[in-house]
A protein has these predicted regions:
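Short coil/turn connectors at secondary-structure junctions
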Residues: 94-98, 125-128, 153-159, 181-182, ...
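Condensing-enzyme catalytic core mediating Claisen C-C bond formation in acyl metabolism
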Residues: 1-74, 173-246, 250, 254, ...
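Conserved beta-ketoacyl condensing-enzyme motif
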Residues: 45-123, 129-134, 263-279
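Short beta-strand segments
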Residues: 5-7, 103, 133, 158-165, ...
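Active-site glycine-rich loop that binds ribose-phosphate moieties when present
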Residues: 125, 132, 142-146, 166-189
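Claisen-condensing/thiolase-fold acyl-transfer catalytic domains that form or cleave C-C bonds
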Residues: 105-107, 116-119, 124-126, 131-152, ...
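Short, well-ordered amphipathic alpha-helical segments that serve as non-catalytic structural scaffolds
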Residues: 43, 47, 74-90, 113, ...
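Active-site-adjacent elements of ketosynthase-type condensing enzymes
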Residues: 109-116, 160-182, 210-229, 250, ...
């Protein structure tokens, strides 16, 4: 199985981080005793700006209903652009696609967004669809792995993974908790699509050599949503960097060792930009220089954390500047559960 192409799409509305800091400062100054703390948390995210599903002023009056209506509309539009960008990069048409996986954690739709795209883009009526909700930030890597699992049994197939995350639409204006203050400075909106091909097709792009899912028991409270009348309220523990130190380091080493590899053998680190503390922990625990994760740092600075779409943005940048033939890569993400997903690639 191979990753043949990645397409990206971003909403048209872009706001730089300093402007967003000013907007949140104005909105929360009367209710938060330490406005400087809000500014500090947002600057610590090391994000330069973010794309938004809606014009900034529209968020002042959003409720759960209007936010989710916007999600369905915008997700269909940017998701369609991402899919077409990926297919065009590979030289395929929607009618060539045999199956599609769709993942999101920032809105709800039934029919799901992938179903709406069958009509909008002209997929075949016999396309196999798998919409996924709840994996959060890990879903980009997990989606690649699950699509590859499918291709083992369907070596002639061409499939698409689509991730759309419109994190801004989950804004909780009345939540002044530290997790929400961190989230409002970190997360942005975007979509990414991956074209994958089975082993019987002509090889294009890196080979998916193996994958591994790891679930950490009794960690449901590390990350996720508390869903209520106002929508999705974030659950985000300060333990996430510690999960890297306690678990992910050893999981990565064990996974690589099972394939006769070690950390020095990895030429391309395709890591989800979970935030500065998470990336610093990953670098420290694996003994990596910052340059090894530079694409991830650059993506974080450019567009923020796009949840499941982010690692696919980093993957797109890696495909544009790949390691030499035969070089190894490792796709890494963590998310609600708490869990991690590792995908071993070879160019």
């Amino acid at each position: 199985m191979h990753i043949a192409a990645v397409g990206r799409a971003l909403p048209d509305h872009f706001v730089d981080q300093e402007t967003l800091i000013g907007a949140f400062r104005s909105a929360w100054a009367a209710r938060h005793h330490n406005v400087a703390r809000i500014e500090q948390l947002h600057r610590n995210a090391m994000v330069g700006g973010r794309h938004l599903a809606l014009p900034a002023e529209a968020y002042l009056t959003l409720d759960f209903t209007s936010a989710n209506e916007a999600f369905v509309r915008v997700a269909t539009e940017v998701g369609g652009r991402a899919v077409m960008a990926a297919l065009e990069a590979f030289g395929a048409a929607p009618t060539d696609v045999d199956a599609i996986w769709f993942t999101t954690v920032t809105g709800v739709a039934a029919p799901s967004i992938d179903a709406r795209l069958v009509n909008r883009l002209g997929f075949r009526s016999d396309i196999k669809r798998t919409p996924i909700f709840g994996l959060g930030c890990v879903a980009g890597a997990a989606g690649v792995a699950r699509a590859a699992d499918y291709l083992v049994g369907h070596p002639d197939a061409l499939v698409v993974l689509l991730s759309v995350e419109l994190c801004s639409l989950t804004l909780q204006k009345d939540d002044l908790s530290i997790p929400n203050l961190v989230a409002t400075g970190l997360f942005g909106d975007g979509a990414a699509a991956v074209v994958l091909t089975g082993a019987s097709r002509s090889a294009v792009g890196p080979r998916i050599a193996a994958s591994r899912s790891v679930f950490y028991p009794d960690t449901e409270d590390v990350m996720g949503w508390q869903v209520g009348s106002s929508g999705f309220r974030i659950v985000l523990s300060s333990e996430v960097p510690d999960m890297v130190r306690r678990h992910l380091r050893d999981d990565i080493r064990a996974f690589l060792a099972d394939h006769g590899l070690g950390v020095p053998d990895i030429a391309a680190w395709v890591a989800h930009p979970g935030g500065p503390k998470v990336l610093e922990a990953l670098q420290e625990e694996l003994g990596l220089p910052r340059a090894a994760l530079q694409r991830t740092w650059d993506s974080l600075a450019a567009v923020g954390n796009l949840s499941s779409s982010s690692v696919l943005f980093v993957l797109a940048d890696t495909l544009a500047d790949p390691p030499p033939p035969g070089g190894w890569g490792l796709l890494i993400a963590m998310g609600p559960g708490f869990c991690s997903e590792l995908v071993l690639l070879q160019w």
